[in-house]
């Protein structure tokens, strides 16, 4: 059985994919993806939180991706991989999701929706971010304490 939060993450990924590939408004894309999956109100709220959080912080998140995946420019990365990373990085940096959960969920989404190499890419990028900033304790950094610099 798929958890409520996994279903919400799937809907968020589908929403972000739709927004990335079309000119659709975020609100319309959220309605489309959550209606398709018949999500509960709690799952819809979590989906909206993820989508809004990623969109609000997209440029900062994309800078982090670029820093830790220099061989894979964000614009050239597959739409699925790019948005899986965006959701996971949002959850790690700006949400209450434990680091281990965010990474595991991202890898599972990569296995379901990505290519054969997606889980390895996702794990490598997220693992590098966590290792660089010493957050391997699998706990979210305290508010305002973890603002990754894009410098070495």
Identify the residue ranges that each predicted region occupies:
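N-terminal interaction/assembly modules
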Residues: 1-119, 123-152
């Amino acid at each position: 059985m798929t958890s409520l939060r996994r279903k919400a993450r799937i809907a968020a990924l589908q929403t972000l994919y739709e927004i990335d590939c079309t000119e659709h408004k975020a609100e319309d894309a959220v309605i489309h993806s959550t209606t398709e999956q018949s999500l509960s109100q709690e799952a819809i709220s979590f989906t909206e939180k993820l989508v809004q959080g990623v969109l609000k912080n997209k440029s900062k998140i994309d800078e982090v991706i670029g820093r830790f995946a220099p061989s894979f420019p964000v614009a050239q990365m597959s739409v699925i991989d790019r948005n899986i990373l965006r959701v996971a990085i949002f959850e790690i940096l700006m949400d209450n999701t434990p680091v281990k959960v965010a990474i595991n969920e991202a890898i599972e989404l990569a296995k379901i929706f990505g290519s054969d190499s997606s889980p390895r890419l996702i794990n490598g990028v997220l693992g590098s971010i966590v290792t660089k900033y010493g957050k391997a304790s699998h706990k979210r950094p305290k508010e305002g304490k973890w603002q990754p610099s894009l410098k070495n």
